[in-house]
Amino acid sequence: MNVLILTASTGGGHIRASNALKSYFKEKDNAINVNVVDTFKYINPLLDKTVTNGYLYLAKKTPKLYGKLYKLSNDKPMMNNYVNRMNSIFAKKLIPLIEEFKPQIILTTHPFSTEMIAYLKDKKKINVPLICIMTDYGPHNAWIRDNVNEYIVSNDDMMKEMIKSGVGKDKIHSFGIPIENDFYDDKKNSIYMNDVNLNHHKKVVLMMAGSFGVKNILGIYEDIIDIDYDFELIIVTGRNKKLYEKFQEKVALSERDVKLIYFTEEIVKYMKCADMIITKPGGLTVTEALACNIPLVIFDAIPGQEEENADFLIKNNMAVRLSSNDKSIRNTIEVLLTNDEKLKTMKKACIAFDKSKSCENIFSLIKEIK
């Protein structure tokens, strides 16, 4: 059986979800041939660079504009029509890949990839079942297309919204966003604690700047580092060398035990040690944190999908949001450190949101409809 997974590099989450599925499928059935393809890179490396850099620029430099474009593309048919036309042109470039690989099923973890395959199906260029895996906590019309056979969504609220917008209930599955199974495995927790050299009797705060690094996390560090409470701090700066170097200077002056980490492929190790995570609410980061049953403290949510992710988490008592006020930031973290009952209640909410069978359920689904 050939399974084609189409994704894109706008942020790290789409690729991570795709690779998690590939790992699980191969573990369950070594005879399955799984091909994960970065759609834009395959079509044209220059196109990939343009789309990826454009996304990063909008998200980091002009987040308000990004939020407006996100809303416009969700609400206005004219905006969607422009994107549709562009994707219909690019879609034809995928035909050689599909003809050569001959997939029995296609999975997509990015809205543009979804739209391209849906277009090819509409024009009768291909006839392959399409499963769309939505990698955030709120739906957006860019994902929703007539020729999608099945949708995988992160939560029941998304199902309700999509049904209201006309998607058939039997097409939508609230399996959760697929991630590596290590995030659900608690057997190694004590090993991780020893590996990271942490005190088992102290609370641990994990600060994550995201895969590309976020400068505002430095200000949060300065607000909380001298809180009068004995906790340990892990900082992961992401792929931002300047940010890492600035933290090196700050950490050297601190009396607190701080573990400073550059970009890591072993984020599960640090999440499993944490009592709370200070992070941006990207879809995959959120899912990984919830799988580890760790309450989130959210900052710098990009208007659009990250705001929707944050809203979902806060509504379900799995996260709190930091304001831009220094005193408020300090107070929020201090309350979570000192109020065991509040932290336990949030942790219980994370535990109740159990999506540990996501990869297993998706695997069963492709076996049913291949």
Task: Please describe what each predicted stretch is.
Residues 342-356:
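A short, well-ordered alpha-helix in the C-terminal region of glycosyltransferases
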Residues 272-282:
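Acidic donor-binding loop of glycosyltransferase active sites
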Residues 68-166, 171:
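Active-site and donor-binding regions of nucleotide-sugar-utilizing enzymes
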Residues 20, 24-95:
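Conserved N-terminal ligand/cofactor-binding loop architecture of enzyme catalytic domains
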Residues 356-370:
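C-terminal alpha-helical cap of glycosyltransferases
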Residues 198-273:
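Donor-nucleotide binding loops and adjacent catalytic segments primarily
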Residues 149-204, 208-211:
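A nucleotide-sugar donor-handling region in carbohydrate enzymes
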Residues 315-320, 325-341:
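C-terminal "capping" alpha-helix adjacent to the active site of nucleotide-linked donor transferases
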